[in-house]
Amino acid sequence: FIAFNWHALPRMAKFALAEATLAATVLACLWRGPDTIAGTAALAGAALVTGGLLALVGQTYQTGADTFELFAMWALLILPWALAGRQAPLWLIWLALVNLAAQLWFARWGMRAFAGGNANLWTLFLINAAALAAWEMLRAAGLREFLAPWAQRIVALASGVAATAIGVLAVIDAQTPRWLAALAWLAWLGAIWMAFRVRRVDVFVLAGALLSVIVVVALFLGKYLHADNSFFSPLLIAAAVIALATGGAVTLKRLATEEA
């Protein structure tokens, strides 16, 4: 009913509805407590409704603000809630907003000359690598909102996807400084090894790093061996991928058994 009649609602009615929803979610969080599942869900809902309210302001008054400003303001407004709520889902929402705001900013104003037109990928890599490092340090410090393995693995997944994309750039993109991309990818792999193998073991994160290695190595071999037009090139690439996957799987299985 509301969706069907939304355009017919007066301006003030739209704002009243959005603000009432925001107030209801905040009150629900205070009532149930931010440490409960219901309270966490309510606070996450409040964070999402805040974005809807900002979008409504921009749509109603035609502020002319850039899209990145919406996401940046959204992230700024929910930061106190993330700090006060001390819940992993809130920090994941905040990190997603920071990623979106930074990507949109770099896409319009960013360092295209430095990044070779790949500012978005570099932004993703830098933000999520820094977020994973900060998350691990705060987890080691014992802060409860950073102790949940599933949340850190989501951050690690985002970091791994971005790092793999940087590794791919080191192989195929002539516009990107390849030495810099290769160095960044190798540094990420080294940091993952130190944090999730030497200091403690997380098989999920290590499996993601292994997949990154397989993708980049296979692409590297495919590029330089395919140039020879040799009959054996596909066989060598397949053998390398199988060897990496098999060796990695055996190692990960052994680590999982040791941790069990």
Predicted region positions:
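Alpha-helical multi-pass membrane segments and their bilayer interfacial helix-loop junctions
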Residues: 1-260
